[in-house]
Amino acid sequence: GGRIDVNIVTGGDEIEQRRFGDRVDHDRRYARTAEFLEVVTRLWDGETVDFAGEFYTIDGAFIPEPPQPRPTVFFGGSSDPALSVAADHAEVYLTWGEPPQVAGTKITEVARRAETRGRTLEYGVRLHVISRETSAEAWRVADRLLAGISDDEIAAAFALHSASGST
């Protein structure tokens, strides 16, 4: 990219979405994101856009001076609709720092889908990093952050994330 890149986030869990007036369900949010990316990337490419979709109707939209170079689209998600949006529209597919086999399976599937569309993506991993002068100091901070969190609380947090629709 150039001076700006964008990380597209389709949304979080259903309750969070409703707080902001968004009542579109998980899969339809990804359909809406696909439409948005179809329109915005065509605009960035300098096209005058006419578009009629389920969520957007655009008549003759254009950007007088499209960004140069075009912003790079970063996109992540683990659900089937997310993988399809990534394959169709992202330049960089992002995944969490999951076990290598889990991340590898997702990346392989996104790459396969992108290839069927004549596209090749780049890949990134999102991690939380604790940086200190020494490894021992970093581990002390990590241990302090994790102190007092039970295995049950960790399991509950994973279950909540899994049920959230943020995939």
Predicted features along the sequence, with ranges:
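Acidic (Asp/Glu)-rich catalytic clusters
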Residues: 1-3, 87-88, 112-118
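Hydrophobic faces of well-ordered beta-strands that scaffold small-molecule active sites
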Residues: 4-8, 73-76, 91-95, 121-127
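Short connector loops/turns at beta-strand edges and beta->alpha or beta->beta junctions
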Residues: 11-14, 79-80
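An alpha-helical appendage that flanks or caps ligand/catalytic pockets
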Residues: 13-14, 20-69, 98-167
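Short, surface-exposed connector motifs at secondary-structure boundaries
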Residues: 65, 87-93
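Short, acidic/polar
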Residues: 75-85
